[in-house]
């Protein structure tokens, strides 16, 4: 029987790239996103390519909806094997201007959503009496905090912490928990970050902030979704069975830890 993976935030960007790679690896795919229109487009595209994929619209920040997502996957495909907590949002705000609304939004999605995904998947693995793999979206900002990305950085440090804690507590149940830490990618998220940084600095033009970050990458290019998907593919495979609690940088040589 083919294995099953849930990927949250899978309608576009890195999440879509991860989902396509796992589909090519032979997984049944549950595509989750809150953007229903884009989600259904991605589901159609996947099915046209012959992938075993179904879409599920939900809000990852709601614990009950994360539990229902996992149950949907089990109903559709019989069991769950891999949970990729990819969904996340960003914000670009100077430290003195960060407010309650931004904090609530980012922590609800990036932190609560990841934790609730960990819990829902782990409980299903335990119920199945099977090993399972939980893979979280961290970031270079989970290793090093960045100016005007304070809230985002704080949420990704939290994701790294929950990844370590979950790995320690779930190891004796055969469940591994790891995270991938992307760097600078040409995605909608980075386009938004670039645009917001221009608003904060009159000397910048669109593309300048992205190029400034990219210029520091030692391997000489910005990140493609496939760079992240390759790591997630490994973490979802049996080859990674002896790795847990790690938040692995995949940034082309930008942050060194």
From Swiss-Prot:
It catalyses: (S)-acetoin + NAD(+) = diacetyl + NADH + H(+). Pfam families: adh_short. InterPro entries: 23BDH (IPR014007), NAD(P)-bd_dom_sf (IPR036291), Sc_DH/Rdtase_CS (IPR020904), SDR_fam (IPR002347). It is an enzyme of class 1 (oxidoreductase). The active site is at 152 (proton acceptor), 156. Substrate binds at residue 139. NAD(+) binds at residues 6-30. Gene3D superfamilies: NAD(P)-binding Rossmann-like Domain. One of its GO terms (molecular function) is diacetyl reductase ((S)-acetoin forming) (NAD+) activity. GO terms for biological process: acetoin catabolic process; fatty acid biosynthetic process. Keywords: NAD, Oxidoreductase. Catalyzes the irreversible reduction of 2,3-butanediol to (S)-acetoin in the presence of NADH. Belongs to the short-chain dehydrogenases/reductases (SDR) family. This is Diacetyl reductase [(S)-acetoin forming]. The lineage of its organism: Bacteria, Bacillati, Bacillota, Bacilli, Bacillales.
């Amino acid at each position: 029987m083919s294995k099953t993976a849930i990927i949250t935030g899978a309608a576009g960007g890195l999440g879509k790239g991860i989902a396509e790679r796992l589909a090519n690896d032979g997984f049944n795919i549950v595509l989750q996103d809150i953007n229903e229109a884009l989600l259904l487009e991605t589901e159609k595209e996947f099915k046209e390519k012959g992938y075993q994929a179904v879409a599920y619209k939900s809000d990852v920040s709601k614990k009950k909806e994360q539990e229902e997502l996992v149950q949907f996957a089990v109903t559709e495909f019989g069991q769950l094997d891999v949970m990729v907590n990819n969904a996340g949002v960003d914000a670009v705000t100077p430290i003195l201007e960060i407010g309650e609304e931004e904090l609530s939004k980012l922590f609800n999605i990036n932190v609560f959503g990841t934790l609730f995904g960990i819990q829902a998947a782990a409980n299903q693995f335990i119920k199945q009496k099977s090993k399972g793999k939980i893979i979280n979206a961290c970031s270079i900002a989970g290793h090093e905090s960045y100016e005007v990305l304070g809230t985002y950085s704080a949420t990704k440090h939290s994701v790294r912490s929950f990844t370590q804690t979950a790995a320690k507590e779930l190891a004796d149940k055969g469940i591994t928990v790891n995270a991938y830490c992307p760097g600078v990618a040409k995605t909608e998220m980075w386009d938004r970050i670039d645009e917001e940084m221009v608003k904060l600095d009159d000397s910048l033009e669109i593309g300048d902030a992205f190029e400034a970050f990219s210029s520091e990458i030692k391997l000489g290019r910005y990140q493609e979704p496939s760079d992240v998907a390759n790591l997630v593919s490994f973490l979802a495979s049996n080859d990674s069975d002896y790795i847990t609690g790690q938040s692995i940088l995949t940034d082309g040589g930008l942050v060194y830890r």
